[in-house]
Amino acid sequence: MKKLRVLVLMHPSLVPPESREGYSEKESFAWKTEYDVVTTLRKAGHEVRPLGVQEELAPIRREVENWKPHVVYNLLEEFHHQQEFDQHVVSYLELLHAKYTGCNPRGLVLSRDKALAKKLVHYHRIRMPGFVIFRKGRKPRLPATLSYPVIVKCLTKEGSLGISQSSIVDNDEKLAERVRFVHERLEDDALVEEFIEGRELYVGVIGNRRVQVLPIWELVFENLGRGSVPIATE
C-alpha cells in the first residue's frame, strides 16, 4: 500500500492526545472518533497530521500548500460555530484542488435541508411519511392530509438533536408546545411528519461514479420504559 500524507480536519477541542492511556472512557468519549481515525491511519502506515479548525481557513491553506497532503480527511461538522457552514470548508478544499473525504458541497447542502431532501426522494417515487414545515414564528396547524400521531423534528439540525420521547405528539396542544420548543430553544424551523413506528436501520454508502453500499446495521432498543417509543434520541 502506498504511504499517504493525510491531513485530518477536526474541531480544535477534539484534537486527540497521542495515547488514551490515563483517560477514562467518559473523558475520551468526546474525541474518540478523532482518535480512532488518526491512530487507524497511522497503523496502516500513513503519515497523519491532525489540524484543529474553527474560525480560520488560512491554516488549511498553509497545510495544503506547504505539506501537500495526498488527501484531506474531513471530520468537521461545523465551521465558525455554525453547522450549516461546514459546506463552505469543503468548497474551499475544492478551490485548493485538494482531494478530500466525505460529501461534496452540493451533497451537504441537500442533506442539510430535510424538506428539500424529502422532496427529491419523493420525485424519484420513493415512499415516505407525509410532512409539513412550520417556519419560525408561524403557529402550527396540522393540514388535513396529515393525522396524529406525528413527530416534530428540527429542519436543519443533524443526527437526533432535539428529538426525545416528547417529540411524538397526538394532539394540537402538544404539537404547538413541541413546535415552540424547536423554534425557541433550538432556533430552527420545525419539520412535522407522520410518525411510523418501525426498525432503525443505517446504511453507509461510499464512492463517486461507482457506489459501494456498506453492510447494514441496526440500532436495537432495549430496556425501554413503559410507554416509550423506539426512536433514536439525543
Language-model segments: what does each one mean?
Residues 66-69, 90-91, 117-122, 146-150, ...:
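Short, hinge-like loop/turn segments at secondary-structure boundaries
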Residues 112-132:
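Short, glycine-/small-residue-rich phosphate/pyrophosphate-handling segment
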Residues 121-122, 146-164, 187-197:
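ATP-grasp fold ATP-binding core
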Residues 130, 150-178, 200:
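Glycine-rich phosphate-binding loop of ATP-grasp-fold ATP-dependent ligases
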Residues 131-136, 193-197:
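Short, surface-exposed recognition loops or helix-turn segments adjacent to catalytic cores
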Residues 172-234:
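Phosphate-binding site of ATP-dependent enzymes
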